[in-house]
Amino acid sequence: MKYNLRPDERATLELRGLFEKFGYKKYKISKFEEYSLYATNRNFLIGDKVLTFTDLDGRLLAMKPDVTLSVINNTGATREKSEKLYYIENVYRENRENHCFKEINQMGLEYMGRIDRYSILEVLSLIHI
């Protein structure tokens, strides 16, 4: 059976295959994070607006404006133990043209933990393919 994929879907499938060939594992995280993660790391974010809400337990949560901070917050990587992860996630950012939030599909990879020259070259080669 042959499927007609859009160019973005085809690119996503090809990148997934490439990342997995190099040992990267798919990382899936919740749509929500504690707002404090983003408030503490505001300088890391692209914009200064974060879509928030209070959950049923009274905690202030945020719709992810960024994936990297969530991965860092939830990974088991240490200076001795590296993790090679990739993600395909939706993030929520301010649309400055109409002052609304927009949902953006984002794909990326993270090499976390012990970093050496090989790991740097690996990531650079993967993003330049």
State each model region's role.
Residues 1-127:
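TRNA-recognition modules of translation machinery and tRNA-sensing kinases, especially anticodon-binding
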